[in-house]
């Protein structure tokens, strides 16, 4: 449930997505904060309808990892919203995790709780970017590329 101004805008986006796509959402966060946000934004009735229709499920968690906190905080705060969400995927109770919160914490939690595919050292983070053609968004990946200098001794060919 992390993210700027969360949970209000996140809840609004989830409810809009449910209205537009054939998906069900497990909304992980402090339930009282989610319900308060729904009330403040006038979304209480819509939220309750989607819960009643089994399109949205509220799942209680501990405090989120803040945007300015170290990614490794996920190891200490076991019941954080990102850890609870990753556990849902690990236990085959969800297919994906979407977070508007701390990207480093999200990646750390995914690695610690779900693991990596064999041979993958640095998983990518993907984001859909809109285009002028609204039916064709573009998937942009942050693959964590680093620039490094390689120092090697000269080969025998170079000294001849």
Question: Each PLM stretch: what is its role?
Answer:
Residues 151-160:
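Single conserved hydrophobic/aromatic residue that forms the stacking wall/gate
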Residues 6, 149-150:
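Secondary-structure boundary/capping motif
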Residues 109-142:
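Short, acidic/small-residue loops that bind anionic groups at enzyme active sites
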